[in-house]
Amino acid sequence: MSISIPWRGLRLQLIVVTGCLLAMVAMIVTSPSQLRYDEHNHIGLTQLVATNGWRDALLSPENRSAAGPLYPAIHLMLSPITHLQPPAIRWVNFGCFLGVVLLLARCKPVEPVAPRLLSGFTLLAVPFLWPAVGMALTELPALLFFTCFVLLFLRLIDSDVVLSPGTFGLAFLAGLCLGAAILGRQTYLVVVPALVVLMFWLREKWSSVLICIINSLAACSWLFVLWHGLAPPHYYRIAESSGSFANLLFSLSYAAAATLFLNPAWLLRQRVTVWIISTLCGFALSYFARNYESPPAKSLLVHTFGNQFGLWIGFVVGCVLATIGVVWAWTTFKTFWRKRRDPGQVFLLLSLGALVLAPMKMTAQFSSRYIVGCLGVLFLVVGAPLESRRYWAARMFVGSVLGTAILWTYFQQS
């Protein structure tokens, strides 16, 4: 039986995406039957909730998870199926990832469904997404609700100017989804100030935006009242300073790296002057701000090349990524200025900028998983075109191989 019309020109893309998904499935199926890495902390919170109830669990000194209640709520709901045991619990994030791809496809309804879906799966080309998808971590459930918020808010922007029952419903549901995302990862709280700024672009719809903001805060503020802060009380003993420029540099670098895998043309088409200035700035910032002992993809590099050589390679790679990060920041600003009259693009760019800046306040450590939370809006901003089939397939292959290797190193950590 022949492939249906919409898929005929997309055979290569379909084969590549299927291969990447099968690789992810194989990694989960063969994953350890013990909890690994931060799964201990997050499943530990879930078990505390089941034993002690929500309030006591969220305030308990035994809670080593800094995330909110969305993750344990989802895993408790699915516990009759997963029994809170690996590898079954890891399928939850895989399902959330499929949901994210479907929602991103809905954000571009003017295009045929086949290219939209395959383009969404280009996210698997981003190597540091693989641990978040293949393990029972907190990023994907929150990303699913945040992507739902983005879809609803974009529809709100395109809706009628007057506050009709339809726009009220969109604003209410969008706020509810954003609040749920914040309950999954507090990082999404930075989108609320972005919505406040966005009201200057949506003056005729300010009431709808305000409803969205109020509902999102109503959905999540109880948690911060309970904690008397943005994280559990014990977490503040870990964080020592008020900000980290090194984390900001890491964040820009990882956002740039993700863009290179999604759509390198969006980033690389710059004048020579921009590259020269960015290279000087990137290496200077890396020298003064980066920690030599904490390079990008440290686990993979140390496992592959040994401690000393792996750290040296990581520092060089970090300098290159810092350069590209500076270029990424400049390109994002240029895109914002060029599309400043498009409320939908302004919304996406403000949200993206806020999420990329947020790790600067996470001073205890930096993790590439912080950038996973902005991959949905990054995808909507930069796109993932399928036209250059061989280059696209090459990026998917390289990214998936690296992602598989990174996920494997995570599975080796007790």
Show the residue positions of the predicted features.
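Membrane-lumen/periplasm interface segments of specific transmembrane helices
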Residues: 193, 197-306, 314, 407-412
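Membrane-interface transmembrane helices that cradle and orient dolichyl/undecaprenyl
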Residues: 109-110, 149-170, 200-205, 386
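Membrane-interface alpha helices of multi-pass inner-membrane proteins
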Residues: 119-120, 164-185, 192-197, 215-220, ...
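Transmembrane-helix signature of polytopic, membrane-embedded enzymes
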Residues: 13, 104-126, 143-144, 162-165
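Loop-to-helix entry region of an early transmembrane alpha helix in multi-pass inner-membrane enzymes
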Residues: 65, 69, 73, 81-99, ...
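Extracytosolic helix-loop segments that constitute the early lumenal/periplasmic catalytic or substrate-binding loops
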Residues: 23, 40-74, 157
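Short acidic/glycine- and proline-prone juxtamembrane loop motifs at membrane-interface regions
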Residues: 36, 131-142, 366-368
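Transmembrane-helix motifs of polytopic, lipid-linked glycan transferases
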Residues: 91-111, 148-152
